[in-house]
């Protein structure tokens, strides 16, 4: 279970390196409505994700795909599904980030060049946002680089502020790490332990550990932020589970975060169902979309052996695999691939055919996975339980999808999407066993 710890603090530290301005002030809380004005309007709580385009560690990391989803999409999904925010915003200076944010249902605040410098702090960007949005009373600054955030965490923090009267709440994680004093090079001094007695090293189970900021979020009321603080007043921390405390800063963090998010990430309100039917568009997914013609006018196509293995693995796991195409492909050519899959070609309405297959097998849409790449696949991608596209799919298909492969069509995308399905199905099985 998530645990929530609360405590007073005597100093302020900024999440992104702004120097402390001394002891945080004791704040007098007030309401905008005042007395004698009828029912007091509830304070406006806004989620704010800061996502400038000039990331130095990983270029455009905020929209780089993590486990098939733009990085910023993970926290936007959690914020939207938490149901505690009156508005959800992304503050950015970049057109591509703006487009992705809007696709996920967020509003966009175009950050000024002054607040987008390398030297600008999170606090600078938040204050600028508040200057343009007088309706906002509380800001939940959620870090885009924390993809394992869950709605329940945000719901509990909102309750701490709205119901328990805290001015600021920030996220922490418990760590069991021994710290030692740093020694300058060339100085002959011995290091000293900072949080342990080496003669009596405790076992992990005998030590409570220490709390560290994990950077997932910082909630604060407007009047506190306007005084130059994100942490202060009546202040509390919120302890997150260790498996949900993921922060991405440099390239080496990426593959580790990807495995963590697949295992512990939040995938939406609707529970995942076990996939029973996998449908793949032929041209541009199974194949690379190229058509070759032999001297005797026979059609020749190519595909990746890895994708054939992916189909075999899907079948072995009990998933029915079927192929579809809007083009009048040569069934003789396709049968020569020896994939042993039912297929339909020259299909003007793919959704109707997939719906017929689904009903034939007695399945709901959540039990169907679809890999497509064209405009003609868009409706199927929106309808199924799990949807994927190759890296080179058209823009319309990418917007409709849940997972974007790193591989291109005909070059391993099918195998990659199959492995993604296996990971998610493991998650379904584990949740059923709990």
UniProtKB/Swiss-Prot annotation:
UniProt cross-references to InterPro entries, sorted A to Z: CMP-NeuNAc_synthase, Cytidylyl_trans, HAD-like_sf, HAD_sf, Nucleotide-diphossugar_trans
CDD domains: CMP-NeuAc_Synthase (cd02513)
GO cellular component: nucleus
Chain span(s) of sequence motif BC1 motif: 15-31
Active-site residues annotated for this sequence: 201
Sequence motif BC2 motif, location on chain: 200-206
Native source organism of the sequence: Bos taurus
Protein EC: 2.7.7.43
Chain positions with N-acetylmethionine modification: 1
Protein's UniProt name: N-acylneuraminate cytidylyltransferase
């Amino acid at each position: 279970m998530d645990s929530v710890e609360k405590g007073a603090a005597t100093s302020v530290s900024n999440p992104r390196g702004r120097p402390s301005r001394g002891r945080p002030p004791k704040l007098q809380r007030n309401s905008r409505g005042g007395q004698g004005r009828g029912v007091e309007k509830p304070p406006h709580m806004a989620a704010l994700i800061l996502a400038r385009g000039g990331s130095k560690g990983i270029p455009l990391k905020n929209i780089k795909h993590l486990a098939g989803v733009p990085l910023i999409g993970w926290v936007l999904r959690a914020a939207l599904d938490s149901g505690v925010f009156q508005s959800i915003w992304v503050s950015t200076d970049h057109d591509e980030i703006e487009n992705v944010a809007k696709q996920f249902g967020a509003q966009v605040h175009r950050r000024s060049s002054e607040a987008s410098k390398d030297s600008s702090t999170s606090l600078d960007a938040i204050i600028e946002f508040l200057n343009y949005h007088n309706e906002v009373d509380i800001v939940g600054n959620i870090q885009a680089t924390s993809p394992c955030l869950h709605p329940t965490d945000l719901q509990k923090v909102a309750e701490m502020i709205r119901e328990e009267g805290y001015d600021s709440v920030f996220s922490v994680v418990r760590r069991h790490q021994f710290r030692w004093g740093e020694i300058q090079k060339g100085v002959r001094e011995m290091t000293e332990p900072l949080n342990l007695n080496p003669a009596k090293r405790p076992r992990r189970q005998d030590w409570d550990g220490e709390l560290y900021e994990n950077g997932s979020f910082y909630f604060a009321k407007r009047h506190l932020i306007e005084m130059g603080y994100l942490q202060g007043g009546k202040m509390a921390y919120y302890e997150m589970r260790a498996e949900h405390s993921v922060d991405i800063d440099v390239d080496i963090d990426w593959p580790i975060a990807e495995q963590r998010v697949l295992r512990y990430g939040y995938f939406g309100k609707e529970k995942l169902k076990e996939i029973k039917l996998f449908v793949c568009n032929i041209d541009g997914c199974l194949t690379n979309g190229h058509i070759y013609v032999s001297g005797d006018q026979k059609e020749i196509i190519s595909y990746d052996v890895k994708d054939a293995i992916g189909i075999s693995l899907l079948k072995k796991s009990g998933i029915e695999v079927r192929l579809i195409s809007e083009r009048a492909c040569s069934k003789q050519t396709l049968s020569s691939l020896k994939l042993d899959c039912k297929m339909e070609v020259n299909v003007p309405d793919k959704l109707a055919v997939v719906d017929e297959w689904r009903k034939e097998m007695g399945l709901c849409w959540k039990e169907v996975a679809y890999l497509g790449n064209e405009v003609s696949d868009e409706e199927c991608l929106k309808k199924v339980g799990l949807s994927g596209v190759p890296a080179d799919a058209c823009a319309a298909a990418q917007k409709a999808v849940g997972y974007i492969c790193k591989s291109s069509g005909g070059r391993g995308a099918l195998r990659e999407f199959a492995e993604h399905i296996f990971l998610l199905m493991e998650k379904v099985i584990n949740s059923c066993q709990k």
